[in-house]
């Protein structure tokens, strides 16, 4: 059975994921950071991990990026072979989601469109897009800012 997915949903999800990935660690990563600080033997190492933990808390509380280098948006899509997209181009929807996420999230724009010309796109597009076709009728999306 074919399932129709609106590209506006993909765009909105990617926008939100760009903002979230730059402001918060996933719960498992946040827990790993706490464990690393607790298990660290070196006083200097403990202090540095404590500063990183404080940075994470400030970023979440004040809605500022965890790191000033918000990097390139790398988008991973697993698309079920029973999925049909409506509403335009998948690549354009992904890039528009990245554009909106980086603009609305007040994230640093540092991507160049052509590496030889070195002109900043001012919206962090184009995204690096990895697509995998899988069985089923679902779309799984992951966004990783790579700074």
Predicted regions and their residues:
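Non-transmembrane, aqueous-exposed alpha-helical and coiled segments at domain scale
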Residues: 1-147
């Amino acid at each position: 059975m074919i399932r129709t997915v609106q590209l506006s949903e993909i765009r909105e999800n990617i926008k939100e994921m760009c903002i979230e990935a730059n402001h918060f660690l996933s719960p498992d990563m946040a827990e790993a950071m706490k464990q690393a600080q607790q298990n660290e033997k070196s006083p200097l190492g403990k202090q540095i991990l404590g500063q990183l933990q404080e940075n994470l808390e400030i970023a979440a509380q004040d809605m500022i990026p965890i790191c000033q280098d918000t990097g390139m948006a790398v988008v991973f899509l697993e698309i079920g072979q029973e999925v049909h997209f409506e509403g335009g181009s998948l690549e354009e929807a992904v890039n528009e989601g990245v554009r909106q996420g980086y603009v609305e999230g007040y994230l640093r724009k540092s991507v160049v469109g052509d590496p030889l010309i070195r002109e900043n796109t001012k919206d962090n597009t184009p995204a690096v897009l990895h697509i995998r076709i899988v069985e089923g009728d679902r779309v799984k999306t992951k966004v990783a800012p790579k700074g």
